[in-house]
């Protein structure tokens, strides 16, 4: 059967007693739409926790190569199981839309389509644009610290090098702007849409709200000077479709929120 995967840092997210659902439970916040609408038609649903979140091991590498390789390994595993027909899709909103682009940038032959819903395509342009840094850039990496916390004595083991680098990179980008020494390494590593172009061999169904002030539409319709990523993928010969409308950082059926 074909597989639709949701790849997220948000499984079992939060303090004990109030955490979100784990990977073995389908909830309204993540895979329920896929479960209700695609499982009856012969698809499988996979819920995947990125490195160092929920029960996944490894170092939490916020949108970095480590995280991308972990996602790639999951796609390869899903595409090679006896019950799988080898075709994998990744679907999700916001961070879970970003993981779709991380997978695309790895170029797995099993990844056949991605459905990024308000998904980040490149971290640097999200946090720094038009000559200034967004205020959230200084704490963006810290915001995901809760993803790696189990609230027990093992939490210190999760403070690995990639996590500590992220804590430094955010305030540095905010304070130094274009003088940021991380510009050419940390943030280039976390730009996925440019790496996927020409390497990814699948289709794209882009879903984006034009009133989204969290993951701005320029993540889809912008790019380096002279580049419109949406058009660039069409021009490169990709099968591209889009659901674009006047909603915020939500799913399209939540347009009134």
Which residues make up each language-model segment?
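Conserved alpha/beta-hydrolase "acid-adjacent" motif
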Residues: 213-227
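Accessory cap/linker subdomain of secreted extracellular hydrolases
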Residues: 13-16, 20-24, 28-34, 40, ...
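Alpha/beta-hydrolase fold nucleophile elbow
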Residues: 82-95
């Amino acid at each position: 059967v074909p597989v639709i995967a949701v790849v997220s840092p948000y499984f079992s997210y939060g303090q004990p007693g109030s955490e979100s659902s784990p990977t073995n439970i389908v909830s309204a916040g993540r895979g329920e739409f896929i479960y209700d609408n695609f499982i009856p038609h012969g698809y499988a649903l996979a819920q995947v926790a990125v490195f160092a979140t929920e029960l996944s091991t490894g170092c939490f590498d916020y949108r970095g190569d480590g995280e991308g390789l972990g996602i790639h390994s999951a796609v390869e595993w899903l595409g090679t199981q006896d019950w799988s027909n080898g075709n994998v899709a990744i679907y999700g909103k916001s961070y879970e839309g970003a993981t779709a682009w991380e997978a695309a940038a790895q170029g797995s032959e099993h990844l056949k389509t991605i459905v990024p819903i308000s998904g980040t395509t490149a971290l640097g342009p999200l946090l720094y644009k038009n000559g200034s840094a967004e205020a959230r850039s200084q704490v963006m990496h810290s915001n995901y610290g809760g993803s790696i916390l189990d609230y027990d004595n093992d939490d210190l083991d999760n403070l690995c090098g990639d996590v500590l680098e992220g804590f430094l990179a955010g305030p540095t980008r905010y304070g130094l702007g274009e003088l940021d020494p991380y510009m050419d390494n940390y943030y280039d590593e976390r730009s996925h849409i440019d790496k996927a172009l020409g390497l990814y061999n699948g289709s794209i169904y882009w879903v984006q709200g034009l009133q989204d002030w969290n993951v701005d539409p320029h993540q889809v319709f912008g790019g380096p000077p002279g580049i419109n990523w949406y058009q660039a993928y069409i021009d490169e010969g990709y099968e591209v479709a889009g659901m674009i409308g006047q909603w915020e950082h939500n799913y399209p059926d939540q347009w009134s929120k």
